[in-house]
Every structure is written in C-alpha cells, then in structure tokens.
Regions:
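Short, low-complexity N-terminal intrinsically disordered segments enriched in polar/charged residues
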Residues: 1-30
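Alpha-helical interaction segments
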Residues: 13-15, 27, 43-44, 84, ...
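Short charge-dense sequence patches
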Residues: 2-11, 55-61, 105-106
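Exposed beta-sheet edge and beta->alpha loop/turn motif
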Residues: 74-133
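Short solvent-exposed beta->alpha transition segments
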Residues: 18-19, 34-87
C-alpha cells in the first residue's frame, strides 16, 4: 500500500513540476522574460542578476529561433541530488524543434521551495546547428 501511495505523490510532483517547467519554457520562447525570471529559484537569482539573466536568455532565444515543437522525453523525481540539500527535485528532458537547431534537447531541474512551489533550479540544452548540415 505504501509504494502505491508514494508513487501517486511522486506522479503528482512530477506533473505539477512539468506544468511549471512548460510554463517557464513558454515564457522564454515568447519573450516573457520577466515572468520567467520570477520562476527561478533564489539560488539562481543570486548567481544571475536580473538584467544580466534577461540579456543572456534573450540572446539564447535569438540563437535558437522560433520554437516549432516540444515533447517530454523523460521525467524523474528525486529527493536527493548529489551536492545539493535534500528536498523535492524533478528532472525533465524535452526533445525540442527550433527554427535554427536540430537534435535539440532541453533539460530542466525544478526544485520545490519552502512554500511548496516549484521553481527552475537549472536549465541546460544541447543541439546541432542547422547551418552545419
């Protein structure tokens, strides 16, 4: 019984985190950088001042071009992540199609804050440039 209940909560955490992740990605894809910045974890905000982060993410989105599609390829809940405090973490991997890239994969790490809200803790990606064909 415990494992069924635990799995149910894990699924809820993953689904809730994925909604926040997709909303955040939608914000950065549609120049809603202020909204996106507000969803960053405090640790990220401490590393990247507001204006610097907005400049960086804007340049990145210009490089990628317009989003054509995005599909979740992996989702994983963990309560422990090496080098980080214990908590609730969700890793999500997306296969994305952008105008200027190919074989584009986006990775999000979300962390639940002390108010039980999911926040973006890390964003990473890999791709090949379409011009390299």
């Amino acid at each position: 019984m415990y494992s069924v209940s635990a799995q149910k909560y894990t699924d809820i955490y993953i689904n809730d985190a994925n909604k926040v992740g997709l909303s955040w990605l939608n914000d950065i894809n549609h120049n809603q950088y202020e909204n996106a910045y507000n969803l960053l974890a405090k640790e990220v905000k401490e590393k990247y001042p507001h204006e610097a982060w907005i400049t960086l993410i804007n340049e990145l989105m210009l490089e990628f071009g317009n989003l054509e599609s995005r599909t979740v390829t992996q989702r994983n809940f963990q309560s422990q992540v090496e080098g980080m405090e214990d908590g609730f973490y969700v890793f999500i991997e997306y296969s994305s199609q952008y105008e200027n890239t190919k074989e584009h994969i986006e990775y999000l790490l979300l962390k639940q804050n002390d108010k039980a809200k999911w926040e973006i803790f890390d964003y990473n990606y890999e791709f090949k440039n379409k011009k390299e064909e």
